[in-house]
Each structure stands twice: as structure tokens, then as C-alpha cells.
């Protein structure tokens, strides 16, 4: 595990056992999402990173492709989480969950280039209720 992941896990102390998008957190598998993308000048520093699982990371970039407003709103919440210095609050988790459900409602029948639905079952397996 990288030093920056260890530092983030120590700072944000995920007592909820959820990543920042409400998926079950497996510390050894967690990924770092750049809030401001590297290609847009975003640094690999704690204030520009969020802790999300690989499925969540893949899903977040699908959301970026299909609905940039939702993507930007989720990233704004991630910025607030970094400013507060602890894992997302219940209210922040509820907003993220609402945004994800809205996206799923609007795009549940969208298909990719191979004719398969773009919202995979694994994207719906969040643990926040």
C-alpha cells in the first residue's frame, strides 16, 4: 500500500467501513481518485484525493462521461470531506447516494457500444442504506 493511502486512511479513519461513495471499504484494495485530474494540473496530494474502491472509481468515471454535472457535484463533496478532515458525514453520504440513484434512474437503460447496459450490477452494490 502506498504511503499516501496509509496517511489518508489514518487521517480519515473510516469507522463506517465505507469508501467515499458508500461502497464497502477494503483497505488493501482502495484506490485514490484525483478530484482535480492530473491532466488538469491536479496534484497527488491528500487535499486533491479521495478514497474509493475500484468499482466506485470505474463508476465515477462513467458518470463523468455521461453526466458531468453529477460528476462535478460529487467531486465538490469530496473537496469538502478533505477540508473537514474526516470521512463523509451522514448528510454527505445521503447526498452522494441521492446523486447516484438519480443517475441510475436517468441512465438505467443506456447501452454501450457493445449493446450492454452501462450500469453494471456491481455499481449498485453500495452498503449505505
Q: What are the residue ranges of the model-derived segments?
A:
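Short, charged surface segments at domain edges that flank catalytic/cofactor-binding sites
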Residues: 1-23, 42-43, 47
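Short Cys/His-rich metal-coordination motifs, predominantly Zn2+-binding knuckles/fingers
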Residues: 21-26, 56
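Short Cys/His-centered divalent metal-binding micro-motifs
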Residues: 49-72
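Short cysteine/histidine-rich metal-coordination sites, predominantly Zn2+-binding motifs
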Residues: 35-41, 68-77
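Short functional micro-motifs and their immediate structural scaffolds
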Residues: 24-31, 61
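Histidine-centered catalytic micro-motifs used for acid/base chemistry in nuclease
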Residues: 18-20, 29-37
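Charge-rich, solvent-exposed alpha-helical interaction surfaces
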Residues: 7, 11, 73-80, 95-102
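Short flanking/linker segments adjacent to small metal-binding domains or redox-active Cys/His motifs
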Residues: 84-129
Amino acid at each position: 500500500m502506498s504511503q499516501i493511502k496509509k496517511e489518508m486512511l489514518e487521517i480519515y479513519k473510516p469507522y463506517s467501513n465505507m469508501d467515499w461513495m458508500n461502497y464497502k471499504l477494503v483497505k488493501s484494495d482502495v484506490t485514490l481518485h484525483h478530484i482535480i485530474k492530473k491532466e488538469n494540473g491536479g496534484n497527488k496530494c491528500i487535499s486533491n484525493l479521495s478514497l474509493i474502491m475500484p468499482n466506485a472509481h470505474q463508476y465515477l468515471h462513467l458518470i463523468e462521461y455521461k453526466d458531468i454535472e453529477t460528476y462535478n457535484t460529487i467531486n465538490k463533496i469530496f473537496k469538502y470531506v478533505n477540508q473537514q478532515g474526516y470521512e463523509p458525514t451522514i448528510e454527505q453520504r445521503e447526498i452522494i447516494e441521492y446523486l447516484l440513484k438519480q443517475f441510475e434512474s436517468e441512465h438505467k437503460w443506456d447501452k454501450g457500444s457493445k449493446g450492454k447496459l452501462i450500469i453494471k450490477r456491481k455499481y449498485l452494490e453500495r452498503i449505505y442504506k
